[in-house]
Amino acid sequence: MPNDFIISQLPSNKILLEGKEYDFYSGTAYLGMNQDADFKRLLIEGMNCYGMSFGSSRNGNLQLDIYDQAEEKMAHWVGAEKALTVSSGMMAGQVVAQYLKTQNSTFFYAPSSHSANFHEPNVGLPNVSFEAWASNICEEISEKNAPHSVIVCNSCDAIKLSPYHFDWTSTLPQNQSITLIIDDSHGLGITGKNGSGILKQITVNENVRLIVVSSLHKAMGIAGGVVFADNDFIDKLRHTAFFASCSPIAPAYLYAYMHADAIYKKNQQKLKDNIQRFSSQLSDSQTLFNSIENYPVYYSLRDELYDFLFQKGIFIYSFAYPIKTGKPNTRIVLSSWHTSSQIDYLIDKVKEFCKVAEV
């Protein structure tokens, strides 16, 4: 069965394919912000105030106040000294990687590191588990003894849902210059206290500079990206030609963000409720999925689950990523926009699949 489709509407908790309606469990809109009516109203208010886009340099001689305001709020939220917003998660990774590339840096990439953070177009990634990589990285850094080591990893495995632990970050060599970059694109907004993500959970020694980069387009529903770091590093990025030549996030999104605390809180709670409702009813079906506690994604090795659920009016994630020719990644992605009745129907059909497939 083909699983590639083209539609002419933005997905929400349902999509229309060839005249038939399907419950939609894919994508990365974990908090459903891109279809939230209250957030849309704030976005329109922002457009009325700041226009639809701002194609000028952030280093020009006329600045909009909303950028500094939003960045200060984001930094306080996640526990960083400073934040810098850019036009995408890819740009957030690249503004950091391309600067560090000029600093006599040696890069060490964890398995499955996102290409947004590559300092070169093609980077070879370790073909081991994150756990195995983490158990050796401290020794590898110590033995290499590079002038400046840059470690790059994701905050979580959002594809296959293997758990990531970060106790190793506090045991990195203390006699070397080290930068640790963590991509929190699939955590920011839905993990950590009040959705603040990974940064507060990481412990490093004084010689290790901690940087968190993230897309804002996923849980947060903001078409942009962000870098969290210390004051000195963010100031350095601000004055690079790379940053100066980039158009910023459309300011209307940051206006909406500044006024959306209650909306985020409401949708975070709804997502938690949906995760609890789904997970608590899995029981004997637990072996079908890899999952992380309190995380809205469920990965299955049983790719035939996609076809089965599709026949039942449920559309789930099933495609190879990041390389199209690879094995499909079959996943169920929950969002705050799903209703209780949708979750119950999904559970019922998952249990039905388990019986048929003898899981």
Where in this protein do the model-derived segments appear?
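Active-site PLP attachment segment
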Residues: 190, 202-236
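Conserved PLP-anchoring active-site segment centered on the Schiff-base-forming lysine
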Residues: 96-117, 134, 138-140, 271
